[in-house]
């Protein structure tokens, strides 16, 4: 790779990092072609961008980014692939699902909404984080619940008073 190509790659990575608040870094080395293809397909279906990157280029892109990645660049050794998503738990769920069949991909670290998570031991926590949409749905459900109880009570009261009037 020439210096110019590296510079362009760093600019592209910096732009990708600037466009998201959710990045997972994992090691997918050792996966055969079929498994890697299945992983890419699953990522595509979930709206996740999966890209194998050079560690030095990713480290420089993180440096150039306006985000504070903390200790995340320290995990950049060996083979690295980044998962870029709009949903915080989607890459974690995919990695966890693939780990049922083999020991890879291994989570190196993640950056989610200004929080840095380092190590494969964080995978369970990251996979169970509720997405923004799930949280909004829960809040709406909680807000609707008291109103539904009141309406139900009023309907029962009204139905009871109609029965008494008919007798």
Swiss-Prot record:
Keywords: Ribonucleoprotein, Ribosomal protein, RNA-binding, rRNA-binding. InterPro entries: Ribosomal_uL10, Ribosomal_uL10-like_sf, Ribosomal_uL10_bac, Ribosomal_uL10_bac_type. The keyword Chloroplast does not apply. One of its GO terms (molecular function) is large ribosomal subunit rRNA binding. One of its GO terms (biological process) is translation. The keyword rRNA-binding applies. It holds the Pfam family Ribosomal_L10. GO terms for cellular component: ribonucleoprotein complex; ribosome. It comes from the Bacteria. Belongs to the universal ribosomal protein uL10 family. Part of the ribosomal stalk of the 50S ribosomal subunit. The N-terminus interacts with L11 and the large rRNA to form the base of the stalk. The C-terminus forms an elongated spine to which L12 dimers bind in a sequential fashion forming a multimeric L10(L12)X complex. Forms part of the ribosomal stalk, playing a central role in the interaction of the ribosome with GTP-bound translation factors. This is Large ribosomal subunit protein uL10.
């Amino acid at each position: 790779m020439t210096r110019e190509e590296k510079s362009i790659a760093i600019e592209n990575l910096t732009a990708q990092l600037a466009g998201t608040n959710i990045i997972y870094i994992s090691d997918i080395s050792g996966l055969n072609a079929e498994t890697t293809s299945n992983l890419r397909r699953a990522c595509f279906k979930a709206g996740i961008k999966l890209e194998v990157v050079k560690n030095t280029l990713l480290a420089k892109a993180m440096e150039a980014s306006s985000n504070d990645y903390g200790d995340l660049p320290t995990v950049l050794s060996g083979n690295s692939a980044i998962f870029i998503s709009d949903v915080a738990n989607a890459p974690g769920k995919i990695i966890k699902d693939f780990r049922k069949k083999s020991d890879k991909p291994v989570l190196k670290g993640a950056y989610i909404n200004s929080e840095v998570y380092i190590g494969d031991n964080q995978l369970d926590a990251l996979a169970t984080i509720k997405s923004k949409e799930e949280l909004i749905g829960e809040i709406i459900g909680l807000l609707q619940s008291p109103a539904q109880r009141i309406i139900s009570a009023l309907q029962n009261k009204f139905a009871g008073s109609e029965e008494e009037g008919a007798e």
